[in-house]
């Protein structure tokens, strides 16, 4: 007997979302009552644009550090294969508005003050593809995303 599996991200109608946005995909409770929250951090409009791998890779490394400086409980923030944003997994319950504020603050730091020396994990020892980074691209994309504003609603623009 095979188990039916539904992958939420493949059920989402990507033609009706309005990026950039933060969307709560769902919350799950563990056997001891612990809660994790899963977020869709969509930075560019699906099927219209994508962030080049080097820029996305650098944003990924920076977010790994910058998010943790701003909020407790981040488990992981990993890029989508389509290169339009990230999945972010958090301990506990959080609102899209709260996470959108954190992402906005991180992107502001990337766009305005980040230098190459600030990017963590860019050596052969600390990164599995250390040559594929671009701070220039990361900064330019951060500026473009911030110019559009980050919404806390995937379907109606509500810029925070």
UniProtKB/Swiss-Prot annotation:
Q: Quote the record's binding site residues for Fe cation.
A: 57, 61, 127
A Pfam family assignment: LuxS
Q: Which UniProt keywords apply?
A: Autoinducer synthesis, Iron, Lyase, Metal-binding, Quorum sensing
Q: What role does this protein play?
A: Involved in the synthesis of autoinducer 2 (AI-2) which is secreted by bacteria and is used to communicate both the cell density and the metabolic potential of the environment. The regulation of gene expression in response to changes in cell density is called quorum sensing. Catalyzes the transformation of S-ribosylhomocysteine (RHC) to homocysteine (HC) and 4,5-dihydroxy-2,3-pentadione (DPD).
Name of this chain's protein: S-ribosylhomocysteine lyase
The subunit field of the Swiss-Prot or TrEMBL record says: Homodimer.
Name the Enzyme Commission number(s) assigned to this protein.
Answer: 4.4.1.21
Q: Name one GO biological process term.
A: quorum sensing
Q: Which cysteines are joined by disulfide bonds?
A: none
Top-level EC class as recorded in UniProt: lyase
Q: How is the cofactor bound?
A: Binds 1 Fe cation per subunit.
Q: Would the keyword Chloroplast turn up in this protein's UniProt record?
A: no
Instruction: Say which domain of life the source belongs to.
Output: Bacteria
Task: Enumerate the cofactors the protein uses.
Answer: Fe cation
PANTHER family of this UniProt entry?
A: S-RIBOSYLHOMOCYSTEINE LYASE
InterPro entries named among the record's database cross-references: LuxS_sf (IPR037005), Metalloenz_LuxS/M16 (IPR011249), S-ribosylhomocysteinase (IPR003815)
Question: Per the record, what are the reactions this protein catalyses?
Answer: S-(5-deoxy-D-ribos-5-yl)-L-homocysteine = (S)-4,5-dihydroxypentane-2,3-dione + L-homocysteine
Offer an example of a GO molecular function term for this protein: S-ribosylhomocysteine lyase activity
The text of the family note is: Belongs to the LuxS family.
Record bears the keyword Iron: yes
């Amino acid at each position: 007997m095979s188990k039916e599996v539904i992958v939420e991200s493949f059920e989402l109608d990507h033609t009706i979302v309005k990026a950039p946005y933060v969307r709560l995909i769902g919350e799950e409770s563990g056997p001891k009552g612990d809660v994790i929250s899963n977020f869709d951090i969509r930075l560019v409009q699906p099927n219209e644009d994508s962030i080049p791998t080097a820029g996305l890779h650098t944003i990924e490394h920076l977010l790994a550090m910058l998010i943790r400086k701003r909020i407790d409980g981040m488990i992981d923030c990993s890029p989508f294969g389509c290169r339009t944003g990230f999945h972010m997994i958090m301990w506990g319950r959080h609102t899209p508005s709260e996470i959108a504020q954190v992402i906005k603050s991180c992107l502001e730091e990337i766009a305005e003050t980040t230098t190459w020396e600030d990017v963590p994990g860019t050596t052969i020892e600390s990164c599995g593809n250390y040559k594929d980074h671009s701070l220039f691209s990361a900064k330019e994309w951060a500026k473009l995303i911030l110019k559009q504003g980050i919404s806390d609603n995937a379907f109606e623009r509500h810029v925070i």
